[in-house]
C-alpha cells in the first residue's frame, strides 16, 4: 500500500497536476506547507548547507525564547555589503556570536540554532515581510512551538514584544516561501508559488531523516 501511494504521488508530480494545485492554492493561504525540497538558491545566494549551521558548538547558550531575544537585543543590524563587503554572505551562528552584527538571516539562523539546541520544534523561514514602517522585501525569521502554540520570532526587531509574537497575530504580515526544520530538512510554503521564479522551480519530495 505504501508503494502504491508513492507511485500515485510520483505520477501526480510528473504530470504537473500537483504543481498546478499548489500554484492555484497559493493565493488562499501562503502558509500552507509542502514536503518538497527546494534548492539552496531559493533561500538566497549566500545560503549554505543547513546541516553546517547546526554543527560546531556555540559559545553562547540560551535555553528559552525570551533569553534568546534578550541576547539578540544586544546585537546590531548591518547589511552584508557594509559589514563584509559581500553582496550576500550568511554567517555561521558561531561567527555571528563573535561579531554580534549581521542582517536578518544571520539573526534568524542564530535564533533557530539556539531553539533547536534547546529542543524546541523550530523552523528557519525565508519569505517576504510587509510590516508597517518598513519596506516590503525578502526577509528571514523563525517559527517555533511552545506550550501556548506556534510563535514567530523576528530577530531584527528591537523589543521583545515585537520580536516574539503569536503566529496567529502576525501571519498576515509575513509571506513564507521556503523553510528548514530542526533536522535541517528543507521544505516549501505555498507563498513560494506567488512568485514567478518560485513557480518555475521543480522540486522533489523531501527526504525524511
What kind of feature is each model-predicted range?
Residues 1-209:
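A structural boundary/capping signal
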Amino acid at each position: 500500500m505504501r508503494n502504491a501511494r508513492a507511485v500515485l504521488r510520483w505520477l501526480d508530480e510528473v504530470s504537473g497536476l500537483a504543481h498546478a494545485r499548489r500554484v492555484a492554492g497559493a493565493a488562499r493561504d501562503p502558509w500552507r506547507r509542502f514536503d518538497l525540497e527546494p534548492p539552496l538558491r531559493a533561500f538566497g545566494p549566500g545560503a549554505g548547507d543547513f546541516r553546517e549551521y547546526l554543527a560546531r558548538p556555540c559559545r553562547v547558550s540560551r535555553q528559552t525564547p525570551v533569553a534568546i531575544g534578550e541576547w539578540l537585543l544586544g546585537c546590531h543590524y548591518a547589511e552584508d555589503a557594509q559589514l563584509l563587503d559581500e553582496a550576500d554572505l550568511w554567517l555561521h551562528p558561531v561567527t555571528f556570536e563573535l561579531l554580534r552584527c549581521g542582517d536578518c538571516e544571520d539573526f534568524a539562523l542564530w535564533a533557530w540554532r539556539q531553539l533547536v539546541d534547546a529542543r524546541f520544534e523550530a523552523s528557519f523561514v525565508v519569505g517576504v515581510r510587509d510590516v508597517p514602517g518598513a519596506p516590503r522585501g525578502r526577509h528571514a525569521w523563525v517559527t517555533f512551538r511552545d506550550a501556548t502554540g506556534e510563535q514567530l520570532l523576528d530577530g531584527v526587531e528591537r523589543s521583545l514584544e515585537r520580536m516574539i509574537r503569536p503566529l496567529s497575530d502576525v501571519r498576515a504580515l509575513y509571506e513564507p516561501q521556503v523553510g528548514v526544520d530542526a533536522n535541517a530538512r528543507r521544505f516549501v510554503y505555498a507563498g513560494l508559488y506567488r512568485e514567478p521564479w518560485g513557480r518555475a522551480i521543480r522540486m522533489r519530495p523531501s527526504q525524511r531523516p
